[in-house]
């Protein structure tokens, strides 16, 4: 199922994105003793993979939905991606950012056409506010990760990798909210079942790993309540 959805997303967004290079890193290969290849998403529009998900989500909406108002919450990359996608499709967007946001990242979002609203001390407070405003006004909130169309859009990285090499033993994917690894890992597992998918997070911001460690599976009795 995920492969067909990602393939559909790839067809939908192809004219709007860059197919980024997939290049061998001689330095990292030498350092690790493995053959290491890099998917150069830093060369994607807006400078990150986030644009894939944002433009796929926006293209999945109809005209009335787009014109109802586009809202996002971000500290930088997702906001820039939603802003550029909105600009391409000719609709305004509002991005909620925390008070301590980088001025350089704010300016980048403004350059792509975002209307910036400063709210709260962290991105989660901004996300809650953006969702609330979108719900109250009939607008659309564009999540950075928690949306199937975002996942399928970001999964197009894997669709490209599949066409750029004959196979991989292992792929290491950075993880924040989990949108990219859901799309990339799901797609590659469907075409190369034996591939090992490894999630990587910075030690000082390992929110996904901490969430998984805190999760407690419900008992059968709880499920019957």
Locate predicted features.
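PLP-dependent amino-acid enzyme catalytic core
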Residues: 1-217, 221
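N-terminal low-complexity segments that are often proline-rich with Ser/Thr-Pro
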Residues: 223-225
